[in-house]
């Protein structure tokens, strides 16, 4: 099963741009939003140093990572590989 971990923070400008794009895809992709300020352990676990960041998991394993604002199509391509 595929899942995207979406790392963001309330103070992050680019995250505010990516947030609505991710929300618009909620029926098409499986994702979980993770606040880096309140979930530092997850940020460390997945090596997140810049946000916004997307980590693609497949069967619990990291398959790919992207950093920065992506378009809806780019996210769908990232997810569907």
Regions picked out by a protein language model, each given a short descriptive name:
Residues 2, 28, 52:
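Alpha/beta-hydrolase fold active-site loops
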Residues 7, 22, 26-42:
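Thiol-based oxidoreductase modules, predominantly thioredoxin-like and allied folds used
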Residues 46-55:
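Structural micro-motif
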Residues 1-25:
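Local sequence-structure signature of Cys/Sec-based thiol-disulfide redox active-site neighborhoods
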């Amino acid at each position: 099963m595929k899942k995207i971990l979406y790392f963001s923070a309330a103070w992050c400008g680019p995250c505010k741009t990516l947030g609505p794009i991710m929300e618009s895809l909620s029926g098409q992709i499986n994702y979980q939003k993770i606040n880096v300020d309140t979930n530092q352990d997850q940020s460390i676990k997945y090596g997140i140093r810049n946000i916004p960041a997307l980590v693609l998991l497949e069967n619990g394993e990291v398959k790919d990572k992207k950093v920065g604002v992506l378009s809806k199509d780019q996210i769908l391509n990232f997810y569907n590989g």
